[in-house]
């Protein structure tokens, strides 16, 4: 605690007789004496707090420390290590050397099903990601490899006899078609002939012919033309 003033300059305060009180020239001397004594008694040692410290005095308990920082060029990525049968999946943080290239595009390629595989609906076909030559999202077709007469057609392949996969769709393959349209051939749509026992409410059969030289014409055939005699 701070020092206590044990002297008084007032003669009416009841100071004990026989003891001489120190004399002060003014009130300012009293305040300076008390302040000097208080400042000496309120010195705080490191780690200790003085309850009698005066207001407005700053105390430092913890010095400022900087946190350690790593080099900014390090970049970390999460990489999973193969797990053993007993241990759980472990993870290790390693620098990532993977860099994406603007020229490389990936495509999904399905691997052929082996002959001894069972045709289960729950099992999906294995897939492998390989580099693709597709550029700009479109397949580049080389027209120089085929002649102008060749036309492409969709051909369904026959189902094998030992195939047990009823849920699988028929495979399809695009092959060159030898069919060539000639300008002299006329296209026509022929309706099936009406039987005699059919109702008379049905419209007459229709025959459509198309030629290069003329427009499309719609011809209605009468019963006499269909069944002569």
Swiss-Prot record:
Which region ranges are annotated with the description Disordered? 84-106
Name it: Aspartate-rich protein 1
Q: What is the organism field in this record?
A: Homo sapiens (Human)
